[in-house]
A protein has these predicted regions:
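A generic structural signal for short, solvent-exposed coil/turn residues
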Residues: 29, 43, 68-70
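A short linear hydrophobic-aromatic micro-motif
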Residues: 34-41, 76-78
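An amphipathic, aromatic/His-enriched active-site/gating alpha helix that lines ligand/cofactor pockets
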Residues: 55-85
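Hydrophobic alpha-helical elements and their junctions with loops/disorder across both membrane
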Residues: 15, 37, 68-72
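Short, well-ordered beta-strand segments in beta-rich or mixed alpha/beta enzyme
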Residues: 4-8, 41-66
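Short S/T/G/P-rich N-terminal loop/turn motif that feeds into the first structured element of a domain
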Residues: 1-25, 31-32, 36, 44-47, ...
Length: 94
């Protein structure tokens, strides 16, 4: 499984449909797509949400991003993430 950071920005539609139950629906959908939500944070700044998810790969991440955007009205920007320990190993190989 690979780790992905999904940064969410609320749209007007997303604000109208906001509810505590939506969080569980997001967790369920990610699980249905073969992944796991490790954490969800509400954040201040240019983005409103941060999801830390484990997914099988880039295709699953794209599908999750598109599916969650369509389902919630939240606009997502998704980036792969690598644990710093793995990054340090890569540096040692350069």
């Amino acid at each position: 499984m690979a780790t992905f950071l999904m940064f969410g920005k609320y749209t007007a539609q997303a604000m109208q449909e906001m509810s505590p139950g939506r969080t569980q629906k997001v967790r369920d959908k990610v699980k249905e797509l073969g992944g796991e939500v490790k954490a969800i944070y509400a954040v201040l700044g240019k983005k409103d949400l941060l999801l830390v998810v484990n997914l099988p790969g880039i295709e699953a991440a794209m599908k999750a991003s598109l599916t969650l955007s369509k389902m919630t009205g939240i606009s997502f920007t998704t980036s792969p993430a690598l644990p710093v320990e793995e990054f340090d190993k890569l540096i040692g190989q350069v």
